[in-house]
From Swiss-Prot:
Keyword entries, A-Z: Metal-binding, Ribonucleoprotein, Ribosomal protein, RNA-binding, rRNA-binding, Zinc, Zinc-finger
Zinc finger extent (C4-type): 6-36
Gene3D superfamilies: Ribosomal protein L24e (2.30.170.20)
Family annotation (PROSITE patterns): RIBOSOMAL_L24E
Gene name in the database record: rpl24e
Protein name per the record: Large ribosomal subunit protein eL24
């Protein structure tokens, strides 16, 4: 079993946890929580949401 990375916040997902969402074009999204899934479905981008690891990584030096 391998650990996955959340497609929204870049958090780690343990084997057997989280959700897998398959879009109409066949691409697969992995979510660590319903919070990440709902934010993605609302059209938000992880880079612009302050609590995500993606935002923290990009804006580390600023």
């Amino acid at each position: 079993m391998e650990w996955k990375t959340c497609s929204f916040c870049e958090g780690t997902i343990e084997p057997g946890c989280g959700k897998k969402y398959v879009k109409k074009d066949g691409s697969v999204m992995h979510f660590c929580s319903s919070k990440c899934e709902k934010n993605f479905k609302l059209g938000r981008v992880g880079r612009k949401v302050k609590w995500t690891n993606t935002f923290k990584r990009i804006n580390r030096g600023q």
